[in-house]
A protein has these predicted regions:
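Bacterial N-terminal signal peptides that target proteins for export
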Residues: 2-15
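Short, solvent-exposed loop/turn elements at domain surfaces
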Residues: 57-63, 83-86, 111, 156-157, ...
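N-terminal pre-domain segments of enzymes
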Residues: 29-67, 304
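Primarily short, surface-exposed interaction patches in extracytoplasmic proteins
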Residues: 66-98, 103-138, 157-204, 262-265, ...
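Sequence context surrounding c-type heme c attachment/ligation sites in exported
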Residues: 201-295, 509, 521
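Core domains of carbohydrate- and sulfate-ester-processing enzymes
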Residues: 34-52, 190, 199-221
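Bacterial N-terminal signal peptides
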Residues: 12-25
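Globin-like tetrapyrrole-binding proteins
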Residues: 603
Length: 617
């Protein structure tokens, strides 16, 4: 019978989908009976595309043989031709430079850098720019902005009793720094996984990698943590973050019952939860040693890192229907059955964290490389090849270019799991270098641009947008280190170094679509609200940056207003103003000043508030 089992009855697939819509995909408490694990045909379950090992495909036949510049382009063009679509012309050098700077560093090029690139007529100038930008510290900061949301990075908890901050993370920034350095040093992604789960257990462990354990160590700590029900909530959050981030699976949906749609059983869930039940979240000195009682580090939590340690290994019983008082079978710690060729082996080394990391980073794991390749693709194209980047299961989207995704995943692993290799493949492709202009005939066939007949015009993240404004006003401070409040008027550092709170996220982050730091975020949302425009028009932050921009532009008193207007456009938008824009600016500047701001400050504010500051073509 086709459908989904719900308790003692079968629902049609359509009705099951309706059920999931109203009751959410993974309810906390199911109404199912206390029943034996549902019988799953594992061979059939492994036929799902995401559970099949990716393979390197033969290049498809294409008609426009001159268009591709990388392997990626062959797959994209073949799909376009099959859909009767044509690729767009290449973007201008100016557009490509701005796109590349913002995508790789999160900052636009300065007018001087733009002029240098536009004036460089040598072969390989674009390729050289890619390499230069990937060597900047800003590259790691840009990529880390993506990853920290996957790890639900934050520096406190969503709850606080009185003035008690014992469960807060004042040194969470050390995990952030480790992530930034990992991307800048091109740490192989399989090692990136191992170190975040088990840096303390590796054979060749280094104390410099211990902050990586913040992936687990910065998780939720609830009050009354000694109670089993509270511990179970913490384990659930850890399993959810781990499996969605690295595997693109919603395994925590199997906490109370077998997963309703994917071949993940309750036993699978408790097998993973047992790893976290055997792991403690702890504070340690930077070398991993215990903090001495009554020391400065103990009293003020200075010079410490928030990591984990193994406790006595503990296998868990299944909690029937999620009820910790109703125990079912004891489950050995192990990996997911659907991702094992036969029966998964039990974890026997301590908590099992290292074995879990190895299972995730195993090249034979069909999900890991696909998931990260798709996440990186999403960063540079605005939409993943799989539109649901943290759900590769039955309720997720099918890949738009399955052969391309698999080919990239295999080659990514063959190239030492190098993120820089992957980024290079993407940005050097003809697909990435297309312009973003609408072609009416193509739009009629593919209005959502699923098949990549043009580049997507994308809205900047809050980090890119705020940092670009600070750079334009000449106020940007490039230093890293400890976090500062984004509400602090003196904080002009890059946005990634702002404090992230689970309890009260900064207003600017909330208003401009920064994700909830309490949970793993699959991808950013793009919203347009009146509150955003009110912030842009009225906030003291924007006013101060407008003053800084006006001062920077008009510093040369010998230049004319026309020259100043041209300089402003070059600085903000990396282009020259049109005749209409020039005339409008000159007319505005001739008017008498109103209010507390000078005419140039008002003009600067208006240009900073423009939509063009928030988008990249």
């Amino acid at each position: 019978m086709n459908g989904v089992r719900c308790g003692r009855i079968w629902l049609s697939t359509a009705l099951a989908g309706l059920f999931s819509y109203f009751f959410v995909v993974c309810p906390r408490m199911g109404n199912a009976e206390n029943k034996a694990e549902a019988q799953i045909d594992w061979a059939m379950a492994r036929e799902w595309w995401a559970f099949q090992s990716p393979t390197k495909a033969e290049l498809p036949q294409i008609n426009q043989a001159a268009w591709p510049s990388r392997r990626i382009d062959h797959f994209v063009l073949a799909k376009l031709e099959a859909k009767k679509l044509s690729p767009s012309p290449a973007a201008t050098k100016h557009t490509l430079a701005r796109r590349l700077y913002l995508d790789l560093t999160g900052l636009p090029p300065t007018p001087e850098k733009m002029r240098a690139f536009l004036g460089d007529e040598t072969d390989g100038a674009y390729e050289m720019l890619v390499e230069k930008l990937m060597q900047r510290t800003a590259y790691g900061e840009r990529l880390a902005s993506m990853w920290l949301n996957k790890a639900r990075y934050a520096e406190d908890q969503a709850h606080q009793v009185g003035d008690n901050t014992a469960f807060f993370y004042p040194n969470a920034f050390k995990y952030r720094k480790w992530v930034i350095d990992a991307f800048n040093n091109d740490l192989p992604y399989d090692d990136f996984i191992r170190k975040q789960l088990a840096a303390d257990l590796e054979k060749d462990k280094s104390v410099t990698d211990l902050p990586a354990l913040g992936f687990i160590g910065l998780g939720h700590k609830f009050y009354n943590r000694n109670r089993l029900t509270v511990k179970a909530e913490e384990w659930s959050e850890q399993v959810d973050t781990l499996t969605r981030a690295f595997l693109g699976l919603t395994v925590a949906c199997a906490q109370c019952h077998d997963h309703k749609y994917d071949p993940v059983t309750q036993k699978d869930y408790y097998a993973l939860a047992g790893v976290f039940a055997s792991t403690d979240l702890v504070d340690r000195m930077e070398d991993g040693s215990e903090i001495k009682k009554d020391s400065e580090a103990h009293k003020k939590r200075i010079g410490i890192i928030h990591i984990v340690r193994d406790t006595k290994p503990k296998d868990l019983h299944v909690f029937l229907r999620g009820n910790t008082e109703t125990k079912g079978d004891l489950v050995k710690r192990r990996f997911l059955k659907v991702l094992a060729q036969n029966e998964p082996k039990s974890f026997t080394q301590g908590s099992g964290r290292l074995e879990l990391a190895e299972a995730i980073a195993d090249p034979n794991n069909p999900l890991t490389a696909r998931v990260i390749v798709n996440r990186v693709w999403l960063i540079f194209f605005g939409r993943g090849l799989v539109a649901t980047p943290s759900n590769f299961g039955q309720l997720g989207s099918l890949p738009s270019h399955s052969e391309l995704l698999d080919d990239l995943a295999v080659r990514f692993m063959e190239n030492n799991w190098s993120i820089k290799w992957l980024v290079r493949e993407l940005v050097l492709s003809s697909t990435y270098q297309q312009n973003s202009q609408i072609i009416s005939r193509n739009e009629l066939i593919d209005p959502a641009n699923i098949y990549l007949w043009r580049m997507n015009r994308r809205r900047l993240s809050v980090e890119q947008w705020r940092d670009s404004i600070l750079a334009a006003s000449n106020n940007l401070d490039r230093r890293g280190g400890e976090s500062l409040e984004l509400t602090d008027a003196k904080n002009v550092r890059r946005t990634i170094y702002g404090r992230v709170s689970r309890k009260k996220l900064s207003d600017i982050l909330i208003q401009f679509d920064y994700p909830d730091a309490n949970v793993h975020s699959a991808k950013r949302s793009d919203t347009t609200t009146a509150i955003q425009k009110l912030f842009i028009i009225n906030s003291s932050f924007m006013v101060e940056q407008a003053k800084g921009l006006a001062k920077r532009i008009t510093g040369d008193s010998s230049a004319t207003d026309l020259t100043h207007i041209q300089s402003t456009y070059a600085l903000l938008y990396n282009r020259q103003p049109t005749r209409e824009e020039t005339d409008l600016g000159l007319a505005f500047l001739r008017l008498p000043a109103e209010g507390k701001l000078t005419r140039w400050e008002q003009y600067s504010h208006a240009l900073l508030a423009a939509n063009e500051m928030m988008f990249v073509d």
